[in-house]
Amino acid sequence: MANYFNSLNLRQQLAQLGQCRFMDRSEFSDGCNYIKDWNIVILGCGAQGLNQGLNMRDSGLNIAYALRPEAIAQKRASWQKATDNGFKVGTFEELIPSADLVLNLTPDKQHSNVVSAVMPLMKQGATLSYSHGFNIVEEGMQIRPDITVIMVAPKCPGTEVREEYKRGFGVPTLIAVHPENDPNGDGLDIAKAYASATGGDRAGVLQSSFIAEVKSDLMGEQTILCGMLQTGAILGYEKMVADGVEPGYAAKLIQQGWETVTEALKHGGITNMMDRLSNPAKIKAFEIAEDLKDILQPLFEKHMDDIISGEFSRTMMQDWANDDANLLRWRAETGETGFENAPVSSEHIDEQTYFDKGIFLVAMIKAGVELAFDTMVSAGIVEESAYYESLHETPLIANTIARKRLYEMNVVISDTAEYGCYLFNHAAVPLLRDYVNAMSPEYLGAGLKDSSNSVDNLQLIAINDAIRHTAVEYVGAELRGYMTDMKSIVGA
């Protein structure tokens, strides 16, 4: 199989990268009726598989799970979860031939083998769906021409998909139709109905392409979503301990600090996050963020270049073929870091303290979001896609670190995301270590001295303008406003 993106000419590549349209709520007036009586079979019962299935069943659809015979015979976790929730479970041979819609929600590295196994069993004219397009775009999987191929990709972990649905809402969702596999011209209708069944239409749906989803998703998870958080945690902890901060407190300030500062980001973007700082702290966070961007911009651009060219996928798939040797080694090394092994502190930290003593953390988030967003847009990815793969998902990943540090983050994210995170982290740590070590303790761990809160008015005005007037802030305000409006409509 050859990389699908690389098989296209430049004009086709740019057209696919630039596909992104925020769909109007009225386009989902038919709900999930288009697939109401279909037999829908889900492959994989992990977080996305189980929670999407629960939502779709609650929306009135017919859901079953196809598992490998050994998973059923040995009553593995996937079988246990599906049966505990009252779903019909069977083998591929038992369920796939009668399926109208097959949802491939298995891990990326299993896609080629899984799709190769189910395709001969799928009936003429059936539909195959993905929640991530890596197999189609990077591996170049070719699907039988009579099969419709779609994507429905909720922009959050599977548990959040379920919780938001139970609240009567949903999560922002990306949908796409593979242009090589839309024989009946109804791929978009199927994807819309599927997204509606999971609750995605209540939060906002982007009509995109397989290529735009893959390239932006890989970039976001490698840089701001995982790589920057891991790098900041490791270096920030080392810095505080070297400055004499008690290890448990240092770890807690970072572990819970990521979640606290990105909660402000979630509600009001970079502007709101920065406004949580005092005026002197805001100025310093802005200056640090500018320094970080200068240092890291070439690394962000290299990751984007390697993602666009297919170099990242090529090297990662080599590691797949080598039994994940690099991934497993890097995972073990992360588990040995000081941050991961620091004692758990029971000391209470007030919410505002995470901002006051975490100026560096705020600067890392600001720099990472802006760099990731701007780098994606400069590569031809539309702003809305870049926003969802940078600022929007950052609080969701920070929440995982708040539970069990980097271990939890790397368990929850895909192996593809984890591999890319380690690549970024290994390059970013040596780039930033001297800068972080040279910082004043006031910027992480101690907080600014209370002697004066005075600032230069003109400097503050200029910095406030620079914070507010960026593309990521403009598009973020628009998309967050849409979600707020939708919550009001759904709750009415």
Curated annotation (Swiss-Prot):
| Bilayer-crossing regions | none
Molecular function via GO: ketol-acid reductoisomerase activity; magnesium ion binding
Q: Which InterPro entries match?
A: 6-PGluconate_DH-like_C_sf (IPR008927), 6PGD_dom2 (IPR013328), KARI (IPR013023), KARI_C (IPR000506), KARI_N (IPR013116), NAD(P)-bd_dom_sf (IPR036291)
* Cofactor (UniProt): Mg(2+)
Which stretches make up the KARI N-terminal Rossmann domain?
A: 15-208
Q: Which residues form the active site?
A: H132
Q: Which UniProt keywords apply?
A: Amino-acid biosynthesis, Branched-chain amino acid biosynthesis, Magnesium, Metal-binding, NADP, Oxidoreductase, Repeat
Q: Known Gene3D superfamilies for this protein? A: N-(1-d-carboxylethyl)-l-norvaline Dehydrogenase, domain 2, NAD(P)-binding Rossmann-like Domain
Residues bound to Mg(2+) 1 are D217, E221
Task: Name its pathway.
Answer: Amino-acid biosynthesis; L-isoleucine biosynthesis; L-isoleucine from 2-oxobutanoate: step 2/4; Amino-acid biosynthesis; L-valine biosynthesis; L-valine from pyruvate: step 2/4
Work out whether the entry's keyword set contains Magnesium.
yes
Which residues hold Mg(2+) 2?
Answer: D217, E389, E393
EC number annotated for this UniProt entry: 1.1.1.86
Every copy of the KARI C-terminal knotted domain together lies at: 209-353, 354-486
The UniProt entry, under PANTHER family, shows:
KETOL-ACID REDUCTOISOMERASE, MITOCHONDRIAL
State the family named in the UniProt similarity comment for this chain.
Belongs to the ketol-acid reductoisomerase family.
Name of the featured protein: Ketol-acid reductoisomerase (NADP(+))
Q: What is the protein's species of origin?
A: Shewanella oneidensis (strain ATCC 700550 / JCM 31522 / CIP 106686 / LMG 19005 / NCIMB 14063 / MR-1)
Record lineage? Bacteria, Pseudomonadati, Pseudomonadota, Gammaproteobacteria, Alteromonadales
What's the gene? ilvC
